[in-house]
């Protein structure tokens, strides 16, 4: 039964505070599994997204894995509204005060915005590395400080390695920089400079401490929906993926412009009713993943949390570890689909089982090992395609309004899905040499 807030507020506040004070597991374990990832603190919580939103679980998971060192460029759309609306934001910090650095620019330039963030971070870290090299080259620099500086230089591009080395370097700097010079020949200058030592080692050490936020390797992410990635921001996204920068793009694909009310985008497949497609969309879905794969050096994955969490974890961890651009396209059930949002994860699972949303990973590192870089992770459809789409109002409403048109479009959509899966299957069965030759032939054919 309903009770007044006043009657339970004090007790529940105490329970909440108790939960916040619980210690984190003080044990080293592999975080990159479905089960173990959930022992990590989410740094995205209590967003104002629609109940059952298919987008937010992906963001929560990414912040659990990389949130304490990640930087996010967020395209305008649903994810920027629930991600950064005043007076509160869902992005938080851990007990050490570390959390995602988040910013939103415009709808149309988000990829470039994230690209610029990464370029700036790369340049600043290169300058910091130069400073550390100068510091440990100072003849009278403390031996322990030199060792800590060298360890950081050796591990600066490794996520966990840079974290451990950074802690050591900061501790040594705090112990060595600006010592008490009372009673020494340098006392007068030391006092005149506000008790700051002006020697070369201390000057360089202070510069390193002033930029200590850069010691841990950053994880650069670019978030956005399909309206941004497939349509309005596609030119910028393509430009960024064509570069060699280590950025990770997460596309939250709802197959419509969700934030503005459900307009059709190039991610909308053949058949459903949407704004600007009131009689059913007559053209197919853009294959953003295959377009990115054509470069040959972009990591690409198509994922669905509700269908295969293990494949999702593999895709996220492989993408983040890949030294280059990566693109993850995530199926996100939306209230605009006309479904029971209390069962959005089950709906996502049905999409994969019906062959509506195939799962795959394209890892260029495999090609370097002489292996096929393309892995098809989903099996052939085991449920009826049309039964699945008729469970969503966006499709069922077309059948009700224009039965003949619906039959025609749904037949075409089912055939397109079957052909797409067969194409992916053939790609997955090729050896590395055959795959390379096929991609080269397709590239020439498109010239």
Q: Language-model segments: what does each one mean?
A:
Residues 1-35, 98:
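Non-heme iron-sulfur electron-transfer modules
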Residues 34-49, 104-119, 126-142, 214-216, ...:
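Conserved thiamine diphosphate
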Residues 48-76:
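N-terminal amphipathic, basic-rich helices that act as targeting or association modules
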Residues 87-101, 312-405, 412, 425:
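Glycine/aspartate-rich loop-and-adjacent alpha/beta segment that forms the canonical ThDP
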Residues 109-198:
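N-terminal leader/propeptide and maturation segments of large enzyme subunits in energy/redox metabolism
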Residues 436-443:
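Conserved small/polar residues in nucleotide/adenosyl-binding loops
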């Amino acid at each position: 039964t309903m009770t007044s807030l006043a009657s339970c507020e004090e007790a529940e506040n105490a329970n909440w505070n108790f939960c916040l004070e619980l210690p984190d597991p003080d044990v080293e374990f592999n975080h990159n599994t479905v089960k173990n990832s959930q022992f990590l603190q989410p740094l995205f919580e209590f967003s104002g997204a629609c109940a059952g939103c298919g987008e937010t679980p992906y963001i929560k998971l990414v912040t659990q894995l990389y949130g304490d060192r990640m930087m996010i460029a967020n395209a305008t759309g649903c994810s920027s509204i629930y991600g950064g609306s005043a007076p509160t934001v869902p992005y938080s910090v851990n007990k050490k005060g570390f959390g995602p650095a988040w910013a939103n620019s415009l709808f149309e330039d988000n990829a470039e915005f994230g690209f610029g963030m990464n370029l700036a971070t790369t340049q600043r870290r290169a300058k910091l590395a130069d400073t550390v090299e100068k510091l440990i080259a100072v003849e009278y620099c403390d031996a322990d400080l030199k060792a800590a500086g060298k360890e950081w230089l050796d591990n600066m591009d490794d996520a966990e390695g840079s974290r451990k080395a950074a802690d050591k370097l900061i501790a040594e700097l705090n112990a060595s920089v600006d010592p008490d010079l009372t009673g020494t020949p340098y006392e007068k200058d030391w006092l005149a400079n506000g008790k700051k030592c002006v020697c070369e080692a201390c000057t360089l050490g202070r510069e390193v401490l002033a930029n200590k936020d850069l010691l841990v390797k950053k994880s650069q992410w670019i978030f956005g929906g399909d309206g941004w990635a497939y349509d309005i921001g596609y030119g910028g996204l393509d430009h960024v993926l064509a570069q060699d920068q280590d950025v990770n793009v997460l596309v939250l694909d709802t197959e419509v412009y969700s934030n503005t009310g459900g307009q059709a985008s190039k991610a909308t497949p053949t058949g459903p009713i949407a704004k600007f497609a009131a009689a059913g969309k007559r053209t197919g879905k853009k294959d953003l993943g295959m377009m990115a794969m054509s470069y040959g050096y972009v990591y690409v994955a198509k994922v669905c949390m509700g269908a295969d969490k293990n494949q999702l974890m593999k895709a996220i961890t492989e993408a983040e570890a890949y030294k280059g651009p990566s693109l993850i396209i995530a199926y996100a059930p939306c209230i605009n689909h006309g479904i029971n949002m209390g069962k959005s994860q089950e709906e996502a699972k049905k999409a994969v089982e019906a062959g509506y949303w195939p799962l795959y990973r394209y890892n260029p590192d495999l090609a370097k090992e002489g292996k096929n870089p393309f892995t098809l992770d989903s099996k052939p459809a085991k449920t009826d395609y049309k039964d699945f789409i008729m469970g969503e109002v966006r499709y069922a409403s077309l059948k009700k309004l224009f039965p003949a048109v619906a039959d025609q479009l749904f037949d075409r959509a089912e055939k397109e899905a079957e052909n797409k899966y067969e194409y992916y299957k053939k790609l997955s069965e090729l050896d590395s040499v055959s795959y390379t030759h096929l991609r080269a032939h397709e590239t020439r054919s498109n010239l």
